[in-house]
Amino acid sequence: MKKYLALALIAPLLISCSTTKKGGTYNEAWVKDTNGFDILMGQFAHNIENIWGFKEVVIAGPKDYVKYTDQYQTRSHINFDDGTITIETIAGTEPAAHLRRAIIKTLLMGDDPSSVDLYSDVDDITISKEPFLYGQVVDNTGQPIRWEGRASNFADYLLKNRLKSRSNGLRIIYSVTINMVPNHLDKRAHKYLGMVRQASRKYGVDESLILAIMQTESSFNPYAVSRSDALGLMQVVQHTAGKDVFRSQGKSGTPSRSFLFDPASNIDTGTAYLAMLNNVYLGGIDNPTSRRYAVITAYNGGAGSVLRVFSNDKIQAANIINTMTPGDVYQTLTTRHPSAESRRYLYKVNTAQKSYRRR
């Protein structure tokens, strides 16, 4: 078990040096750090597999909160896309007690991602007077869960009525699954509307676009992380988009992890980057709808890759786009962009933005 603890201690140091696809300039140190982070995550996944068994690896992601405790024998998994909370344990003694404790802490955890290490088994989850999941989950009587007494009673109900077990050949896994309320996505989005409106006014970016990016990137999960270390609600990367924004604001260095895990700071930085894409990197595109399609795609795959779809010369690329209808630009980006992820990304964000415009 010592090697798992050592990995957990090393993880935060390596994670802070990583980055992802969003941003502009090539950075050799970033490439090395990204490779190191990939190696670390591979080791972390391998260690979880050793403990839990084959095909039982679950790791935190942009839309998945996963926290291990009890020497990695118990885990809480919130799937923000599916709207499910699954608490599991492989503890050989008193598994119900391990599940009960994890259920209560998960239901009552706060919304400060910087205080929780998702890459260790340290029990650093604090019970909050304003639980992050309040209103997104109701108990067996249909009531939202704010206090420890109600959470404890619900945990007892779940263990009595919904406890399941399965064997993977190596371990017996005990689990309880909780369904979130049907409109859990809207409940989370509502938490951040004030911050979105403030950033929208500050940078001149449409609220509906900010919300659509947040939904697509993280499903409004403030704990969002990625294998390439994009952080927070808008999946901002310290050493690429974060650095670009800081430079444009006259700041040196890069935003810290704690800065990007703060929802207001994350939304401000992500929106500032959208404004940079719109006004600077892709400002040569005249039609606002065509430029919006380019900005959305660039937020995922970079402005350079967007322009290269049309021409290797940036100025010529903008000129070509300016001769096309917005529909043709959309069609081109969703069919000819070299990245399948970026092609899907434009479709997802554009669809989500339409729904927010109707509200």
UniProtKB/Swiss-Prot annotation:
The keyword Kinase does not apply. Coiled coil: none annotated. The keyword Lipoprotein applies. It comes from the Bacteria. It is a lipid-anchor. GO terms for molecular function: hydrolase activity, acting on glycosyl bonds; peptidoglycan lytic transglycosylase activity. A lipid is attached at residue 17 (N-palmitoyl cysteine). PROSITE patterns: PROKAR_LIPOPROTEIN, TRANSGLYCOSYLASE. Keywords: Cell outer membrane, Cell wall biogenesis/degradation, Lipoprotein, Lyase, Membrane, Palmitate, Signal. Murein-degrading enzyme. May play a role in recycling of muropeptides during cell elongation and/or cell division. Belongs to the transglycosylase Slt family. This is Membrane-bound lytic murein transglycosylase C. The gene is mltC.
